[in-house]
Amino acid sequence: MAAGGFKEFVAGETLDQDEINDYLMQGMLVFANSAARTSAIASPVEGQFSFLKDSDGVEFYDGSGWVEYSGAPPLFDFLVVAGGGAGGSRLNRSGSGGGAGGYRNSITGELTGGSATAEPSLFLPSGSFTVTVGAGGTGGAPSTRGSESRFAQILSYGGGKGSGLDAGAVYSAGDGGSGAGEGGDAGGIGRALLLQGSNGGTDIFDAASGGGGGAGVVGGNSTGVVSSSGTGGAGGAGLSSSITGSAVTRGGGGGGGARNTGGAGGTGGGGAGAGGAGTGSAATVNTGGGGGGSGYNTSGAGGNGGSGIVVIKYPDSITLTIGGGLTSSTATAGGFKTTTFTAGTDTVSF
């Protein structure tokens, strides 16, 4: 009967029976199977450990029976992107670009929101947790911010709404995961919350608005010297992640609208801003991109924000039970499972 512990003896030292049993109790006893263990240990003591070769499992005696020892809770990596804010819509002005949804990433070597170093992975004990995929904001006057996404205690804030003007009421650029751009006289840029993204860009005059902030880069400022030749600010760029096995960029800000030329949508699904009297472009679904701002002097709405996404990566020994309110898919590779949630909210257990 082998033991995992050891003692270094000195010349002349002896051990009595009780001391031998004490040392064996502190070691890891190795057996072919549970039957061999029962034969060897007729009266196990609480706290005693053993290793069974047939199952490659470690068990401990809890005072009434042998219990599998699972060690530390499993480690989950995550990418949690909230819904992007919608672009703004402004009569006699141009609408600003919506901000990207908050972006939180734990993959080593990649970046999280605001181009910061990736967050730590998350230990989760067996049980249940909530997953929510945030919807994108809706373009209009006023437009709306994106909705939050969640994985357990990891929460990403929705992107800020673009600035707007409706029936004389001015709606300022919204704060959010990433902030919306500034539009005309609507009170400044939207700002990123808790380092989950970037601030929006500024405008230089009322006919060309700033771009929404992206997950990785601040929204662009509008440019030009007179209102008739202005260009809306480009949406800020998003960030790339390979958590699914392929590099995908998400979290682009929406482009600002303008009297002349709308700003480009940010890399990572941001919608383009409109020029002239056009309607802002919608962001790409499941990127958390911001919607593009509307053009000048138009009743057209800003573009809708893109819905968010939640991706988790965990050991392939774990099997998740996913509630029916979630839309998901799972792939297995290299000893890990990767589950991607694209819509809904519900409880997940394992």
State what each model feature region is:
Residues D56-S64:
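Short beta-strand segments and strand-loop junctions that repeat across beta-rich extracellular domains
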Residues L75-F350:
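Low-complexity, glycine/proline-biased repetitive segments and flexible coils/loops
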Residues S55-D56, T345:
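A generic structural motif
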Residues E13, V45-Q48, G127-S128, G308:
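Surface-exposed loop/turn positions
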Residues A3, V58, A82-A86:
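Bacterial Sec-dependent N-terminal signal peptides
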Residues G63-G71:
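Tryptophan-rich substrate-binding surfaces of secreted polymer-degrading and adhesive proteins
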Residues L15-F49, K53-S55, S70:
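Extracellular/surface-exposed low-complexity repeats and stalk/linker segments enriched in Gly/Pro
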Residues M1-D22:
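Short, intrinsically disordered N-terminal pre-domain segments
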